[in-house]
């Protein structure tokens, strides 16, 4: 298996730290808002990486954190006049709603920054004791020039970084590129006691401490988006390797951006679509299929037409699966097998090998999906030759085709499985949720029109009627939100 390692700037053979065991840390969201489609890409892709390792028989330790202490959370909480940790917990719960819809498996561990302050303080103390950190007025900074290899992940020198960075000049720092490990407490912000006074962690130290706790040093794969290469992952390497005198992570994987009109999708640019907005228009399986339809290191430009095309492509798989299930229900008789049965069995073996070859080449999901289409085509051809009955041998081959489709799906995670029958659910439950979302949004629009006309009785009647049906409306400064009661 070959993985493109950002650190080496090349594909390298994957050799796990521990035989038969893969350790992965993927940077999770800063929980101050619902996730957008750009956040969903690494979520779905690294879930697929994990699934493929499991398919190959590895034991996988998968850690994905939540940054629940951050400037963005504090600012958003101030706007909404609630406690920052309460706001963060709210959006952690909302994250799981979206992740579950996209059929993303829960990580083995989902650590939160607020629950790992002790580990963070311990790591900062080690850096201070070794001369890599210094204290100024209750703030603690990492001295980047104390780590000789700073810049090895991004491939840039400190001078180049400083010239191109938008760094606020702080005369208290020894170097403009030094970054905060600990921030002194400010009124209204979450804070914890520390050897340097009350305060809270900086962003970068959080992942270093949590990755070390759950995976140890020299773990296998650290993942995230391209935008995390610098400064976040560069700083993680500096902190962890300066403190431990050992490699931090061995393979660094970064996915490309989702773009709109060739511009990165991001909350800061305001050109983003929330996952739940997309799921109001398209079924979850189609959205996941779309996210895997392009190689993970390539940019993925967003528009509705691409999702429509993804839906049509996925329907080809579902059509083959429907036909296969019909054939598997045919009665069995004793007789001669249809011509070409042996060739079909060989074709199944070939397609499996091609699929694995694609995934072994830096997780090329786009190519792997093309072999899924080949499989659907071959299933259609074989099933089309069947009559009203099948032999035991033919039934065995149909079962092999079903197993192969399930194995491909086990890796790509597109369709959910009926635990009782073992069959894949061709129509996902999320399709009903999509209809519900659309209907509720339509009703909200009608209510808003009534409110704009000062027709308060109609607006109240709509709100009360929805509440009786288990749908609660919340009027917020950002607009009307709804949720299912209970």
UniProtKB/Swiss-Prot annotation:
EC number: 6.1.1.16
UniProt entry keywords in alphabetical sequence: Aminoacyl-tRNA synthetase, ATP-binding, Cytoplasm, Ligase, Metal-binding, Nucleotide-binding, Protein biosynthesis, Zinc
Residues involved in ATP binding: 267
GO biological process, alphabetically ordered: cysteinyl-tRNA aminoacylation
Localization per Swiss-Prot or TrEMBL: Cytoplasm
Binding site for Zn(2+): 27, 207, 232, 236
GO molecular function, one term: ATP binding
EC class of the enzyme, as a word: ligase
HAMAP family from the UniProt entry: Cys_tRNA_synth
The protein's name in its UniProt record: Cysteine--tRNA ligase
